[in-house]
C-alpha cells in the first residue's frame, strides 16, 4: 500500500479523488500542489456568471483552508511545479520539493486561443482565476464576440445575450455544435439563439484583432470587420501535458493512461481533463467522477479497471437545454427526429437500426434516462 500520495492540481478531478480516498482511508498522507488559490468552485457555473450578475468571488464554495481541515491534507497553493524526477519519486518547485510513493497528475486543460494577430486581446473563461482577471471588462462590455460555436461557445452566447449584450458568435463550421452532432439535430438550438438576437457568423474565420480607441476591431474573411468591446475564445481545451512530457511519460493528445488510470510510469497516474484514457479524452464531469472512484481504490492497493457506461452530456443553454449521449458525432448514423412544442427527441441509428446516439431537448429531456438504458455499452 502507498505511504504517501501527492496530487498536482486542485480542480474537480483532484477534489473528487481526495473525497474518495478519504472515504476509504482517513490517515494516509495526502499532499496537493497547485498554481491557483485551491478554493473550490463549480466550473460549469462560469457559463452563467454574466446573466446572473456573479463576481468571481461569489463562485467560491469552500476555501482551501476549509478543504484542508475537512480532509486532513497538506496544501500548497500558488505553487508552480517545475519538474518531476520520476526515478527519485520527487516533485519539485522553485523553492520546495516533495517525495511521493504515488503521484497523480490532475493538471486539467487550458483554453486554446487561435493563433491570429492580436490573439492577446482574447479572453478565456476556463477558470475562476481567468474570470476574476476579466470580469470588469465583461460586465461593462456591450458588444461581445465569441470565437467558437461548440458546447462552451453556445452556452456563453446564450448567457451574454440573456444579460442584454449584443453577441456575435463566429465558427468556421456550417452549424453550431458541429463536433458533437449533425446540423439537423443542432438546428433547434441554432434557431433559438438567432431568435434571441445572437448574430451567427458560420463558415467564417477570424483573421485578426486590433485595439482601437472605441473597442476591438475584429477582421474576418473577405476583409469584413466588426467592432466589439470584448472577444472570448471558446475554441476548445488542450490537456496540460508539459509536466508529464518533462517526466518522460507517454503523451498523445493528453497524458496516456490505461484502464487503471496508470501512465507509462507505474507510480504516476493521471486524472481528469489532462488524461487520455485508452485513447479517449473525456472532459466531462461524469467520467471524471467515475475515474476518481476507481483511482482512489487503485492508489490504496486495489487493481480495479475503469468501466465507463453510456453517459449523458448536458448543454446548459437555459432557453433550450439539451442532453446527449452515445456516438452523436458518427457520420454514418441515420437520424430520426421527432419535434414537438415541448421539445425534441433525435435518435441516431446504425444500418441495423440499433440506437447508437440520441439528443433530447427541453421538457423531453426526461426521456433521456430511458434512452440511455438502450444504448450499447
From Swiss-Prot:
Reaction equations catalysed: 2 reduced [nitric oxide reductase rubredoxin domain] + NAD(+) + H(+) = 2 oxidized [nitric oxide reductase rubredoxin domain] + NADH
GO cellular component, one term: cytoplasm
Subcellular compartments: Cytoplasm
Molecular function GO labels: oxidoreductase activity, acting on iron-sulfur proteins as donors, NAD or NADP as acceptor
Main location: cytoplasm
Flavoprotein in keyword set: yes
Gene3D superfamilies xref list: 3.30.390.120, FAD/NAD(P)-binding domain
Cofactor dependence: FAD
InterPro entries, alphabetized: FAD-bd_OxRdtase, FAD/NAD-bd_sf, FAD/NAD-binding_dom, NO_rdtase_NorW, Rbx-bd
EC number annotated for this UniProt entry: 1.18.1.-
Database matches in NCBIfam families: PRK04965.1
HAMAP family: NorW
Protein name: Nitric oxide reductase FlRd-NAD(+) reductase
The species this protein was found in: Escherichia coli (strain SMS-3-5 / SECEC)
Recorded name of the encoding gene: norW
